[in-house]
Amino acid sequence: MAVSTRQALLQALSAAGGSYVSGQQLAETLGVSRAAVHKAAAALTAQGYALEAAPRRGYRLAGGDPFCTEAIGDYPAPIYLYDTLESSNRTAKLLALDGAPHGTLVLTAHQSAGRGRLGRRFESPAGKGVYCSVLLRPEMPAANAQTATISAAVAVCRAVKKLCGLELAVKWVNDLYYQGRKVCGILTEAGTDLESGQLEWLVVGIGLNLTSTAADWPDELARKAGSLYPGGPAPVSRAALAGAIARELLALCPAFDCLDEYLSLIHI
């Protein structure tokens, strides 16, 4: 499905993180006329986006972080976006059981009962992180499911580097660090065919702290947790970053052949 000019404009302004972008630059980036940029900007304003236009400065999103599917742009599978969920993984697993297709993306602005490995709680303050789950249906043995977690770590690192210009480090197997603090966790859950030992589905959950601060976490967690942009603002929208991570993960599936890249990211 082609990306509309309106969607492309929203993505470009989201990536600018609230800064002005000139009409000429947007026209060149989007490959359209300045009149088309103006028309798309008017359409976004009519939809309720806090978009500002200023002479000789261009356009900007006042909020800088639209949490909507349009910020994701073109995506090859269904997207489910929520203001709050108990857990994005829980919702994705229910969708898997209901027959949702490969690549289905679930993202939420807040999790009331986010989980990490071994049943640990994952703190998910509203509007301050990327909380998403990707449903995969690879044809592979259940014994190889851990390769999906490894690939998800690579996908997050790739997306963060592309959109934010930041380099993350990996701690085996599913924790990602930035400047010595944990900023991301990955939880992979699976459904298997007991007779064949093959996977029926995988749900890869990703929790990435974007603008959280120590005040958002319990004292014990605050001593070791971190964010990419503590206190904000972030130069990229949560939805756009979630979409980028999901696309990177889908590009690695089903081969999940990225072990060398994963090992090169282990610095902790």
Language-model segment annotations:
Residues 2-161, 184:
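N-terminal lobe of the biotin/lipoate ligase/transferase fold
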